[in-house]
């Protein structure tokens, strides 16, 4: 077979004789990404519910990364990384003889894709190795940083994931240049395929910015200003060198990564204390990114034809220069430089806007990165000047200038938050450098400090719950509302902590605050009665009781359908306090839509069925789990405001497969209601009599060919028991998504 990739692809795309005379292009071969989406690009992409299948993991299902990581001698690993940092390689020479700044950028850009709005992105799975992130313009030449670390990865093998290694290398880089970090936690397990479930923006060209509307309003859930950037354009908005306009972009993008103004200033200043930018020549000299590079480059991209193509001739961002006189040492020189000069606009050799001291000041104060006989003036970026001229950032920056110890502490904490924000609860942290301090952004829950309920207690509590007057609908809806806040990306949310009783969750529209308060009041009464009757110190948290009550309701509904099942329940959840709940941070978890409850908030860009798929993805559900849960929740009456939409049963509150049987009934015809594009009417095909109403979410299980295949399984006469047992299994999975103590 030919070794020339381009020739092979060209031949594949050439029209063969006898083809359609108007077919100017061939559809891609399946190996090139062809398939159904080429014909129907708007069809539901259920593949996002089959992420990282076990068959794609070369380590096998039995591999335990946490156990493997615990075998590491972490100080020895860090020494090996430190050795890499100060051993310059001819194929990619280190600036100033130290790869530390390079590794900080790599770690930052690994973690910096995180956005709080949907919990996706971040460094938790090592996605920087894969497209599109490995080829983003903002990640230029970071392929070399990972190659430099390959000897360390090779030595420690599967005990050290790429995801952990990239973040750890950033920490070691900081420490090797004199900075004291806040800590490090391992536990990021590698995946083996790119994330196909992250919406990075609508643009189809690098650095496009179609994501804005109105007065520079950035589309949710995006966290960067242009396609292929981590945060902001360092030259200013769309390359306009306006520090105040840049400050607005900085504030918005960092806020979307859960950083406040002080953390933002500390991160930018701390990161730009080290290293330099690279723009030695015309960027047209730079070749394609890794994903577009020829086969023989072996995954390395951005080949540079300017001069030697490396070292002093490197081209990455197009900006050129260092911020401080001490680019590989931790000190306060960033702010000393920022406030020590007046700045004039200039351009780099690559033509990018940047700033230099006015009147030739600062000349000779900055060492050259590769030639000790040369020196330069410092350089600042438009985004750096924002820290001096923005009225909010400026006093923070001056305080850090005058109090370097405060900068060091703020940067250490912000760096730890940046690199650990998507790891979820502290229970997932591994290693000897995990900080002892509890941090609000970690969504802390108390440790269990009491005896847990046993099987007899659980049985007695179920009896009390079912005799309380609360309906199956109320109990199921409350448990679902508590647990379904979980997000698989950043591992936030879930039932542990019972934060559904706290602000902001108790006030969310989707949770029906008045109804929720009544249910929680009754459950709290049951909890208090249980505690009052105990003399052995045994307790049940409200978090546990909410889940237990929902399970009891499911069991009751199954019994009424003729099936005796037990919903798995393991106590051990605790109740968080309002003081340890960041209201603003938790507000990001509020569902804009929840198809499982047939809830659709106002102003949604996507139709309801796409939003259902997105929520199922956040809940780490498979397509069959999604299907059985919707069908079960409909007949259990868990809809928002007890709506009849999709309640395709004559016996609400009974766990039957009626939703599927009636949806697929050939005697029913469906048509839009005419009043609401999310509502459809199901009428008797013979009489025209209105029989049911349903939403887009409901009808998609009959319309989409893949979902219909699952629906047909559960609608079958022999699937009644299977439906119940599959629903119980999927329900239990959702209730336990945040129970890392059970792993």
From Swiss-Prot:
<feature type="cross-link" description="Tryptophyl-tyrosyl-methioninium (Tyr-Met) (with W-108)">
    <location>
        <begin position="231"/>
        <end position="257"/>
    </location>
</feature>
<dbReference type="InterPro" id="IPR002016">
    <property type="entry name" value="Haem_peroxidase"/>
</dbReference>
<feature type="region of interest" description="Disordered">
    <location>
        <begin position="1"/>
        <end position="21"/>
    </location>
</feature>
<comment type="function">
    <text>Bifunctional enzyme with both catalase and broad-spectrum peroxidase activity.</text>
</comment>
<dbReference type="GO" id="GO:0020037">
    <property type="term" value="F:heme binding"/>
</dbReference>
<feature type="cross-link" description="Tryptophyl-tyrosyl-methioninium (Trp-Tyr) (with M-257)">
    <location>
        <begin position="108"/>
        <end position="231"/>
    </location>
</feature>
<feature type="region of interest" description="Disordered">
    <location>
        <begin position="275"/>
        <end position="296"/>
    </location>
</feature>
<dbReference type="InterPro" id="IPR019794">
    <property type="entry name" value="Peroxidases_AS"/>
</dbReference>
<feature type="site" description="Transition state stabilizer">
    <location>
        <position position="105"/>
    </location>
</feature>
<keyword id="KW-0376">Hydrogen peroxide</keyword>
<comment type="similarity">
    <text>Belongs to the peroxidase family. Peroxidase/catalase subfamily.</text>
</comment>
<dbReference type="InterPro" id="IPR010255">
    <property type="entry name" value="Haem_peroxidase_sf"/>
</dbReference>
<dbReference type="GO" id="GO:0004096">
    <property type="term" value="F:catalase activity"/>
</dbReference>
<dbReference type="Pfam" id="PF00141">
    <property type="entry name" value="peroxidase"/>
</dbReference>
<feature type="active site" description="Proton acceptor">
    <location>
        <position position="109"/>
    </location>
</feature>
<dbReference type="GO" id="GO:0042744">
    <property type="term" value="P:hydrogen peroxide catabolic process"/>
</dbReference>
<dbReference type="InterPro" id="IPR019793">
    <property type="entry name" value="Peroxidases_heam-ligand_BS"/>
</dbReference>
<dbReference type="GO" id="GO:0005829">
    <property type="term" value="C:cytosol"/>
</dbReference>
<keyword id="KW-0479">Metal-binding</keyword>
<keyword id="KW-0408">Iron</keyword>
<comment type="subunit">
    <text>Homodimer or homotetramer.</text>
</comment>
<keyword id="KW-0560">Oxidoreductase</keyword>
<keyword id="KW-0575">Peroxidase</keyword>
<protein>
    <recommendedName>
        <fullName>Catalase-peroxidase</fullName>
        <ecNumber>1.11.1.21</ecNumber>
    </recommendedName>
</protein>
<dbReference type="GO" id="GO:0046872">
    <property type="term" value="F:metal ion binding"/>
</dbReference>
<dbReference type="GO" id="GO:0070301">
    <property type="term" value="P:cellular response to hydrogen peroxide"/>
</dbReference>
<keyword id="KW-0349">Heme</keyword>
<feature type="binding site" description="axial binding residue">
    <location>
        <position position="272"/>
    </location>
    <ligand>
        <name>heme b</name>
    </ligand>
</feature>
<dbReference type="InterPro" id="IPR000763">
    <property type="entry name" value="Catalase_peroxidase"/>
</dbReference>
